[in-house]
Amino acid sequence: MSTIEESVKSIIAEQLGVKKEEVTNNASFVDDLGADSLDTVELVMALEEEFDTEIPDEEAEKITTVQAAIDFIKESKK
C-alpha cells in the first residue's frame, strides 16, 4: 500500500469516525461509511489541507469512494 493510500485512508477513518479496517478502496463514503453531505465537505477540506492541494467543487462532487479520493490525490501530486 502506498503512503498516499495509507494517508488518505487514515484521514477518512478519522474524519468519518469509522475503523480503519472499514475504509476499503471500494467503500462509498455515504453508502458504506455513513457520511452525510457535511461529512464529505469536511473530508475534502481535510484532504486538501493534508496534501496541500486544491480540490475544485466539480471534482469534489465526483469523489464519492475511497479509491476516487486516492486517485485524485495521486493525480494532483504528479
Curated annotation (Swiss-Prot):
GO terms of molecular function: acyl binding; acyl carrier activity
HAMAP family membership: Acyl_carrier
Pfam families: PP-binding
Principal location class: cytoplasm
Entry GO CC: cytosol; membrane
Entry-linked InterPro entries: ACP, ACP-like_sf, PP-bd_ACP, Ppantetheine_attach_site
Positions carrying O-(pantetheine 4'-phosphoryl)serine: S37
Record domain Carrier: where: 2-77
PANTHER family: ACYL CARRIER PROTEIN (PTHR20863), CARRIER DOMAIN-CONTAINING PROTEIN (PTHR20863:SF76)
UniProt name for this protein: Acyl carrier protein
Localization in the cell: Cytoplasm
Single GO BP term: lipid A biosynthetic process
Family: Belongs to the acyl carrier protein (ACP) family.
Gene name linked to the record: acpP
Function: Carrier of the growing fatty acid chain in fatty acid biosynthesis.
Keywords, comma-separated and alphabetical: Cytoplasm, Fatty acid biosynthesis, Fatty acid metabolism, Lipid biosynthesis, Lipid metabolism, Phosphopantetheine, Phosphoprotein
Pathway: Lipid metabolism; fatty acid biosynthesis
PTM notes: 4'-phosphopantetheine is transferred from CoA to a specific serine of apo-ACP by AcpS. This modification is essential for activity because fatty acids are bound in thioester linkage to the sulfhydryl of the prosthetic group.
